[in-house]
């Protein structure tokens, strides 16, 4: 990219969290001391929200035309735009919720805080998210996997493929579903396509593909993906709060319309 890319690994925990808390503290001080100034007033205004959302939409469209190797989502302009949107949301909430009333501000708080949590956890979590691939052969213990760069890394669990089953359509013999039965630290679990197994807080195992033996009759091994997302539940909390706020807003509008 023309403006360079950000090394997200630098912001891995706890640096990302510390920077987020420090940013909120600075915004709070700025709002308290200069909240009536022209710059802060404009930055938290609805017009600024429209500008930021329009720029984000344009960047998303432009990002679709950029080659994958350019890593548009980690480019300085795009990340800077998302940080500006987070700062805008924070200032809007600080200004609106100075005198909080549940009946008046509850829906507003849920929507805006939900969006903020989902965005921040997505950005901070990018540095802590790991996707590893491992090849499991029947009856063999595996305790290492490979990242996207091909580097071998240790797994937190030892896994063994016990058996594998492929379900086919009787009409044309095409694969409908495939399943794998594993031992994860001697605990049995079942994997299927789009049906992962959770092995810890924010860590899931996905079944990706399989390979047949030379005769093409039996499965000799399968490929699994171990995804470590420690910020996943914070993101889910943000989404739930956003949905709750939307429902709350709709109900409030309906009640006010009947009065």
Language model features with spans:
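Solvent-exposed, non-transmembrane regions of integral membrane proteins
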Residues: 1-259
